């Protein structure tokens, strides 16, 4: 399972979605062409970003099945690592956008 860190995007949801589709998506598609399951890692953002991020990950998962594509929103490396480990052990989970809270998320997910 490959991690793809999206990198900084504008604060506004519309501008962030536009930059993602114009600049980041081609790199994501190239990564998926390698044939490995993929986890996108976004920086945390407010609720206005949820819709476009979820739509992206769901469409990528549909178009690239049987590969699995999921997305996380987190800054905490331990939370990202725990979620990545969970997703690696959950073969039926795909097309999900999971905002993470690093406060205890690592321990909770590692017990699953």
Where are these regions (language model features)?
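C-terminal helical subdomain
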Residues: 23-26, 54-55, 67, 72-112
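Catalytic loop of short-chain dehydrogenase/reductase
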Residues: 1-65, 72-76
């Amino acid at each position: 399972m490959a991690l793809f860190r999206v990198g900084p995007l504008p604060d506004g949801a519309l501008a962030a979605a536009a930059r993602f589709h114009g600049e980041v998506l081609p790199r994501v598609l190239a990564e998926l062409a390698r044939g490995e399951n993929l986890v996108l890692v976004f920086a945390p953002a407010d609720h206005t970003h949820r819709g476009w991020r979820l739509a992206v990950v769901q469409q990528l998962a549909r178009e690239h099945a049987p590969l699995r594509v999921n997305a996380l929103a987190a800054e905490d490396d331990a939370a990202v690592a725990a979620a990545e480990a969970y997703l690696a052990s959950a073969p039926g989970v795909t097309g999900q956008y999971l905002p993470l809270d690093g406060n205890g998320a690592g321990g909770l997910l590692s017990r699953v």
